[in-house]
A protein has these predicted regions:
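Conserved beta-loop-beta element that borders a ligand/cofactor-binding pocket
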Residues: 95, 127-152
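Aromatic pocket-lining residues of Rossmann-like dinucleotide-binding sites
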Residues: 11
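Conserved Rossmann-fold NAD(P)-dependent oxidoreductase catalytic core, especially the SDR/UDP-sugar
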Residues: 77-124, 133, 141
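A conserved pocket-lining segment of Rossmann-fold NAD(P)-dependent short-chain dehydrogenase/reductase
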Residues: 164-185, 196-197
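Glycine/proline-rich active-site loop of Rossmann-fold NAD(P)-dependent oxidoreductases
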Residues: 123, 150-162, 197-199
Length: 199
């Protein structure tokens, strides 16, 4: 996805060895190593992680609650198990669904309080990671990001309703309460920030 691409662009600042793992991996930089794997398969995940000092998980699944409930915990278990076995540091790029409704700023101290079914799945994933960290079995950090905008995000709310309208000489549209603050994440910044967290 777009965050994986932006992360891959940022990683050469920290390492000369980047392995991109996907069902259909494509190079972002000339020196990228490509590794085809399905992270729902534990053996393929183990092989994909083998030899890695840092593992970044930026994968996405179909935006469907039934898929999320069944596939996300399995995928996460496979990645956690592989990182534990390989002694790899783990960086999970997550959204903010697990926070639920927040009045004010979101920080590392914001409580996990999901109000949606997808938020409950994300909270479960966060718990899976942090349980292993607290037991001393895993070094991990969870990056959180709000709604995206930026290059290669043509379907983002901001791109469609604001920037595309401006390009056409139209007024921007906004379907959110104009009196409430709403955070957005610029995708190149998300990639750079995620790279920093692993180094």
């Amino acid at each position: 996805g777009v965050i994986g691409k932006e992360l891959a662009k940022a990683l050469p600042q920290y390492t000369d060895k980047t392995r991109l793992v996907s069902r259909n991996p494509k190079k972002v930089s000339e020196d990228d190593e490509l590794f085809e794997a399905n992270l729902l398969n534990s053996e393929e995940t183990m092989k994909a992680v083998e030899g890695s000092e840092v593992v970044y998980l930026t994968a996405g699944l179909q935006y469907d609650i039934n898929v999320w409930r069944t596939q996300w915990p399995l995928l996460m278990k496979n990645v956690i198990d592989a990182c534990k076995k390989q002694k790899s540091k783990f960086v999970f790029f997550d959204n903010v669904y697990s926070y639920g409704k927040v009045d004010g700023r979101m920080t590392e101290d914001t409580p996990i309080n999901p109000v949606s079914e997808k938020g409950k799945v994300r909270a479960e994933l966060n718990k899976m990671i942090m349980d292993e960290v607290e037991k001393g079995n895993l070094k991990a950090i969870i990056a959180k990001a709000a709604d995206f905008y930026g290059p290669e995000t043509p379907l983002s709310f901001v791109n469609i309703m604001v920037f595309e309208n401006y390009k056409k000489g139209k007024k921007a549209q906004w379907f959110i309460d104009v009196n409430k603050k709403h955070s957005f994440t610029y995708t190149p910044d998300a990639g750079k920030g995620t790279a920093i967290l692993g180094n």
